[in-house]
Amino acid sequence: LSLNLYDVNKSLLSASMLLVAASSLYAQKAKVEYRGQAKIIDIATITPTGCIMNMNDKETFFEGKCVVEFKAIGRPTERFVLKEKERLNITFIKDENKKQRSEIRIEEVQLTAKKKQFSEIEIKQEALQNLQSFSLGDVLQQLPGQYVQPFDNTQFKNIVFRTASGASITGSSQIPGGDGYGNKAFGVQLMINDVALSNNENMQSYDSANSSPFGLSFNTSNRSGTLTPAQANYGVDLREIPTENIESVEVIQGIPDAKYGDLTSGLIKVNTIAKESPLRLDASLREGTYQLGLTKGFRLSKEQALSLSFDYMNSISDPRTSLVGYDRITTNALWSYNKSRFRNKLSFSFSQNTSNGKKDPDDLDGMVINVNNKSFSLSNNIRYSFGGASKRSWFRSISADIGVSYASQFTERKYWLNQGARPYGTSTENDVYYASYTPPSYENTAYADGKPFNIYTNISTEGNYISKSKWSHSYSLGINYRYGDNFGKGRYGTAGQFATMSSVGDSGSGMRDYNYRDNVLATTQYAFYMQDNITKRFANKHVLRANVGLRYDIQNSASTFSPRVNTYYQMGKFTIRGGVGLTSKAPSLNQLYTGPRYFDMLLGDYRLPGYYSAAIMQTVVTPGDNSDLNPSRSWKTEIGLDYRFSFATINITGYYNKLLDGFTTMAIPRVMDKAKVNVNITGTEIPTFEITGTEKFNYLQNRIVNGYESTDKGLELMTSFKRIESLNLVIGFNASYTETESIKDASILTIEKPKIIDNNFQYGLYNDTKAKNTVARASFSFDYHLPASGLIVGLRTDHFLIDKSFTSENDIYPVGYIDYNLNRVMIPDANRKDQLYQNLFRKRTEEKLSGLKNKTLHNVHLRVTKDFLSGFRLSVYVSNVFNLKPYNEDGYVYSNFTTTSFGANISYRF
């Protein structure tokens, strides 16, 4: 089946025109009292000239010498001229259909992401629908520095802020890995209704003892696409968060309040509410993905409400083969109770996420990944406000946020091996023994079975105080507790699941079964914090606000003091902002408890077909856990300027973030006493052996340590234009420029074995190679909004201005060496080029520049949404509407560029 792009675009244009033509009108009725007469009129907008609207508990009115105009689409303008001391009263008539009215029909509805007081960005109302959103990750693509990603729901999605380390949100373009991206993604905290959603207990990996802390596990690629399930150490998989019941999303890329901890990159706050709402059915379709959603809100009583939602999503990377797929089932129940001083919000959630891989009939050795995750969570937000509020309400309220989550995670990896019978290590202690053999051909399988459990608790008290000089203080004191564990069966699999030996003398890192329940200890985090939000309004109408906080964390016995300050000074239309703060992120269970490290060496392999196969293996066991890991830390600094023009508000923010003690890999030299064996062979009997002595054998093993550093600095611009009433047009613009430099700590040196054997040097020591990434992106949004017609036609542009990745040349001269006794010797700087060390000189690698280089790329995306009074709502989404081609300066396809694709969403409110 082939589609003609011209016909498709023509059809979309026709559909857009049809939606415009099908518009219907709406205005609110009000009773207007003027000069002793009352009149019922329709009001959509009120335009006063010479006075402002006054409101109190009883009425709304205009007073004084002025002109007031009431407008409604399709109605004549009502104009009232008031003289001195005359008054015009307005009483809005209760709209019986208000509950059924869509937000799209409200003129003031938020259409774009908005900056709040400091550098927080809020997305709510129609802004949540700017992009076709199957999950929270899609919603966040409209933030500054982000972009519309190539569509693919078979790979895990997470996000990083204000960094040039890899792609912003993972997509089919690439799977960012490495310490740079990994530390930033791991440092993002996601909270739903002020309860942390944790991935710290995820241990779904199969070689954490030997691999990088941010190595990818259980992922595979074939001709139908790439399947990558949720990964340990990378933060929460945003695919698991549907948007059905989200009320608003707030993103803090800068300095968070002292209440929030266990983060280094940023904070995402998702808010959901329980309210009465009609039954709504949603259906979405895009490429190989479809989604069904059902929501309903009930008003149980005047004080109580209950919201229920159900969501199902099925995604196939390539519908022609169905070899790679992802399914999500989510149910949510939210109950709220609000009465006078007492508020309570109780939430329950169940979700099942499965990643399904199928065997490619044309790839006999292809790898298949299957994942089945089920999770349960229960959270409660409770708040009690004390009576007698005054200027000095020392204890105005007390609140508690409590969450418990439990998940069952099962991951399977399997592929066919046909390499002949090979010996593999099985011992779990230091030993020389007869090794087992794999079958000549067999299906190799590896499993990870996890049962992560998490508790989150935050208890705080709030109060306020106004001094005699009118300084307002709104303060809070709180304690925070986190508990994490994993009760799963752990890692296990078939024979030779990780490493086998093909010839005598072969050696390598082995793998053994590792039970989480028996070996993993729970992690705990305690925190105490205090925050004072200070506000002062001066006589000249200038406003000063400062949020000052201090947090003390005890994370797995490591303590951190985190001062945090956000402040702004407003002078009319001009505001200057600034902030500085320290945050920290505790290591995950998967980084702390890796299991022992096994080093296997094949000493002998003797086979007599039909009689025996005898492999002599030596195993050396090294303790593998990293209980001495400390939290990573990040100093965050920013300064900003805001200015309100008559036509727009401009926000400029400069930031400088320094990550310290990030998680990375360090090579550790080891020495073993390699056994010398004497083998006795007698006829057809199984050979016997005896150990006659030992000799030293050196090797390297990896270990996770604190030692990664990076610096992110850049500028961020957001512009919110005032609605152009004559065109019904809302314009938004954002842009960002970021430079990221990264390197391992000076104490973590690169260790390499010399190419030429030297009796004096076992290994050479070299400085780590520096890397610098630079990214600049911009985005425009144009939303044509007819609220009375329930119509939005939106265009969003993505501009890839700079995308450069620069890797400097390697350090060819050693800074030190390790001798055969594993003694580390440092070389003075003046002697590094001495010919004595010529066998340690490395081959020079050239500087490398990759990315777009000097080319820029631009993309355009379309959204058309129409709301019908009958209850139907239809949205059409087109990515890369002009079918632009994404080639970089070298003529290669730029993988971050979204190709043309079509999607639609239809919903019905009963």
Go through the PLM ranges and name each one.
Residues 219, 659-661, 799-844, 854-910:
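C-terminal beta-signal and adjacent terminal beta-strands/loops
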